[in-house]
């Protein structure tokens, strides 16, 4: 089978840091944070997430805000962000079983790749992609169909694993088998994630070898 993994909140325990940059920017400016803010920005990537955050009322240029976000996250991902429990062991198990492992994330290569290398799992993946490699967000079905095409795989042989309900629901629309994984940051949306997933799990070790 072809496994396609999200990164933030799925492989690494990073969502409090990643979303926190934007949440704290709004709070520091005394701007109310929408209830669905984290769920909304998660599939978008840094650029569109920054655009959306600024649109809520931040008095800052997009260029300066992007620079702030980039520097803050680079430091965190290259030094502090840790793998979720059981990730390395499960990935190694799936790889040994002959499955193709891949990453598709909204996070950019400049801190995605160093983080995967720091934890010694980069070479387990056949492809490590960000949405920048496609020009689409994870809220668009075309990114999943194109990923399957690039992997020379039929959609029904693809297993997509993500903690975001929007991304999971979108991937499922293409015919991929979807695994929703619980993440504490988006616990309020766990019922929604469970509803749109073919399989819902709470721990990475529960990912099946299909």
Regions found by a protein language model. Name each.
Residues 1-93, 97:
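N-terminal helical cap/lid subdomain that shapes the substrate entry/recognition surface
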Residues 1, 92-95, 108-109, 113-210:
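Asp-based, Mg2+/Mn2+-dependent phosphohydrolase catalytic module
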Residues 63, 81, 106, 137-138:
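Non-catalytic, surface-exposed connector residues within folded enzymatic/regulatory domains
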Residues 32, 100, 177:
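Residue-level detector of anion-binding/catalytic polar loops
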Residues 10, 105-107:
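Conserved phosphate-coupling serine/threonine residues in phosphotransfer and NTP-handling enzymes
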Residues 11, 83, 101, 136, ...:
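Conserved SAM-binding loop
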Residues 22, 73-75, 100-103, 131-133, ...:
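N-terminal start-of-chain detector that recognizes signal peptides
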């Amino acid at each position: 089978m072809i496994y396609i993994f999200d990164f933030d909140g799925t492989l690494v325990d990073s969502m409090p840091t990643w979303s926190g940059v934007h949440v704290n920017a709004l709070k520091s400016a005394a701007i109310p944070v929408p209830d669905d803010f984290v769920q909304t920005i998660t599939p978008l990537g840094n650029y569109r997430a920054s655009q959306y955050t600024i649109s809520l009322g931040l008095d800052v240029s997009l260029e300066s805000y992007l620079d702030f976000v980039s520097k803050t996250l680079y430091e965190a991902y290259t030094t502090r962000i840790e793998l979720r429990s059981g990730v390395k062991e499960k990935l190694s198990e799936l790889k040994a079983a002959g499955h193709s492992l891949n990453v598709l994330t909204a996070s950019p290569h400049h801190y995605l790749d160093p983080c995967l290398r720091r934890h010694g799992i980069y070479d387990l993946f056949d492809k490590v992609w960000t949405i920048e490699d496609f020009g689409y967000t994870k809220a668009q079905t075309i990114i999943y169909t194109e990923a399957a095409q690039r992997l020379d795989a039929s959609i029904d042989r693809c297993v997509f694993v993500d903690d975001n309900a929007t991304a999971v629901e979108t991937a499922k629309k293409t015919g991929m088998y979807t695994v929703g994984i619980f993440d504490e940051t988006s616990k309020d949306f766990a019922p929604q994630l469970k509803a749109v997933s073919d399989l819902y799990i709470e721990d990475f070790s529960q990912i099946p070898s299909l």
